[in-house]
Curated annotation (Swiss-Prot):
Disruption phenotype: A double cshB-cspB disruption mutant cannot be made.
Cellular component terms (Gene Ontology): cytoplasm; nucleoid
Gene Ontology BP annotations: regulation of gene expression
Compartments where found: Cytoplasm, Nucleoid
Protein name: Cold shock protein CspB
InterPro entries in alphabetical order: Cold_shock_CspA (IPR012156), Cold_shock_domain (IPR050181), CSD (IPR011129), CSD_CS (IPR019844), CSP_DNA-bd (IPR002059), NA-bd_OB-fold (IPR012340)
Species whose genome carries this gene: Bacillus subtilis (strain 168)
Gene, per the UniProt record: cspB
Length: 67
């Protein structure tokens, strides 16, 4: 699992990017966010995740919000 911070997330469109120190930003789709209820992320929020190869390159999977 990697750790990063949410760079930005558009809850209307359901996607955004996660910043990872020393690496390129990683695309995140709302469907990759773990948990119940409305799936969104806040700018600057700490998250842990895995990287998988998507249709358009690397993207986040199994995203969990850090306490």
């Amino acid at each position: 699992m990697l750790e990063g911070k949410v760079k930005w997330f558009n809850s209307e469109k359901g996607f955004g990017f996660i910043e990872v120190e020393g690496q390129d930003d990683v695309f995140v789709h709302f469907s990759a966010i773990q948990g119940e209820g409305f799936k969104t992320l806040e700018e600057g929020q700490a998250v842990s995740f895995e990287i998988v190869e998507g249709n358009r390159g690397p993207q986040a999977a199994n995203v969990t919000k850090e306490a």
